Amino acid sequence: MKSTLKNACYAMALIAGISSCSKDKSNDLISENKGNYILTVTPVASTGVADYLLTADNLESGTLSTAGNGLEQDGTFRYYVTTNNKFFSMLYGQGNPGAVTTYNIQNGKLSKLSNFQTETVQAFAPVNNDLLLVKIPRTYGNKANWYQVDTDKLLITSEGQLDVANLTGNGETAHFSWLKQVNNKVFAPYFSIKACCADGFGTNYPDSAWVAVYDYPSMKLEKIIKDNRTSFIGRYFVDGLGVLENGDTYAFSSSVATTGGVFSSKKPSAITRINAGTTEFDQNYYFNFQDASGGMNITNWIYIGGGNFVVNATTAAEKGAYNTGVHIGIVNVNNKTFKAVTGMPDLDKIGSVTDHNFTPKDGRTAYMGVTLKDGSSFVYKIDAVTATATQGLKVEGGTITSISKL
């Protein structure tokens, strides 16, 4: 996913005008590089353009270029999700109509399936065979709109509203950081925001975490669970939940709540747990990441299996509500351990790292996009067992913004 943390106005596109869907008549294959990996790349020396879509057959060696390859998308900001063996590319329209373009891979090449007119949402996740999308208000008193998109039919099959203003019970409104399917329910962690008063994303309640639990597919609110040991879960447009093979759900807090533009949480960046089959925080589990890492806070993570997460982190000096950390480490939530990854480029040479990365979920491996300040871009293979990073595929012509596989 493109680095949404650098600009809080970034959001994802939602399918709104299904009647305006247009099928690609020729269903032409559009990528010259065969392979089931999909890399999105923002071209160098270009402004106001969206990512190129490139395919590759491996991430560990070779060179891939935007020159004469891939698909140039329209629009500016794009966000991505893969589910049901399809790749969804979603345009954020910035006040104009957006689009959702759907692809699959045939014989190692991207093939366009459909294109939909859109509007803007701020949280989304695969649930069963659907994409669940939620448009979240930033003004107190307004309701959130949800949409269920059937990923076989590429149709909206159900929609409704959520009363986010009454979730908090404290006079502020709830803003979901993300959505996650947990068994047959949808967990929606949220932060409490004023949504007014020249402090829209500020809060008077910085030291609590909440998760709204919804039935699926009815989206009926079942309960709200709360934990006062951390600040809110995840961050704006960042998935702060990870579900293990045994069904346990882990949650990270960055501790980046603000009041009046100033960090106000007294809680450290930490990890908590909701045990499988329950809808309560486990008060016997708490992992103080800030202490374990020598004072850093988690900004993103990706679950790779076996209790291991690859995490991005920032130091206290680098801390920001929308900053993506360039310090890479391995967290094992079972053992409550943190190991810094070696082999990454020097920190002062890194321009950006991708938020949306790929893992085969083998308990060991993740692939992360890194773009250096000199403009060169590479995929790095992260080995959780050895806590090392190895430079792999070189990408010429732009900044890597996401890595996926179909």
Model-derived features with residue positions:
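Bacterial Sec-dependent N-terminal signal peptides
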Residues: 1-39
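Post-signal peptide N-terminal segment of secreted/secretory-pathway proteins
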Residues: 51-155
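Beta-propeller blade signature
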Residues: 52-57, 100-102, 143-154, 201-220, ...
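Repeated scaffold domains used in trafficking and secretory/extracellular systems
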Residues: 71-84, 116-129, 168-179, 231-241, ...
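Acidic, serine/threonine- and glycine-rich low-complexity intrinsically disordered segments
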Residues: 180-317
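Intrinsically disordered, low-complexity segments enriched in Gly and acidic/Ser/Thr residues
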Residues: 279-375
